Amino acid sequence: FSQGGKFMIRQMTTMRIASDKEKEQRHEIPLFPCSTYISDWKKGGIDGCHWHWHKDVELICVVSGQVKAYCNGQSYLLEAGDGFFVNTKALHRYQAQGHELCHVCYIIFNPELISGGIGTIYHQKYIAPLINDQTFPCQFLDEKRQVDKQILQKLKLVFQAAETAQPGYEYDIRYNIGKALLQLLLEYKPLAYKTAKKPLRMERMQTMLDFLHWHFNE
């Protein structure tokens, strides 16, 4: 992907991470809270990113190489074509594997970009059940699995729209992210419309992160 166009796909080389591991996330266009990035990781150089979390949702796609994703006490090996979903406030990190250059594209966005705000049916029916369920912090997207392949195809369309920045690209980005999230909800969280009990470990971890975030500077 190039870095031209109004909605520039930026190269991610460094991150600002607070003491409580929250990543500082600023979107270039505040009225359109969505950022697209590319990163090149390789052992011996910049080989990934450290533990962090953010209030935004993240979707990544591996273009080449191998990347190991860590989240919720699990690790997932992502190969070229695979992807990864990271829910809001989920602690995670990535690390390149092998000696081949890893080229990764990712999208970070405020859920309200898709829902239009908490007072909409889109938020209440589709977005809230996904982002408020801490039993669902992440999801590996296997390019060889048909449903995951459809989700990954939506991500590719998002990057194409961001790269070309043709008139109306905001609609294309919002639509394709929304469809990807809907497929995630329907395929992996069929019970998400019901209140799920949070695992005690996840609940304690989030409580600790929230406490550190609000009280560290006092």
Regions found by a protein language model. Name each.
Residues K68, R93, H215:
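Detector for the N-terminal beta1/A-loop initiation region of ABC nucleotide-binding domains
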Residues F1-G83, K89-A90, Q124, T135-Q139:
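Generic protein-terminus/edge-of-domain signal
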Residues E58-C61, Q150-K154, N176, Q183:
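Amphipathic, well-ordered alpha-helical segments in soluble domains
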Residues V86-N87, F109:
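A conserved hydrophobic position in a structured secondary element of the catalytic/binding core
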Residues P137-D148, A162-E218:
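Short, Lys/Arg-enriched, Trp-marked, Pro/Gly-tolerant hinge/linker segments that flank
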Residues I9-S35, D40, Q95-F159:
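A hydrophobic/aromatic-rich effector-binding and dimerization subdomain
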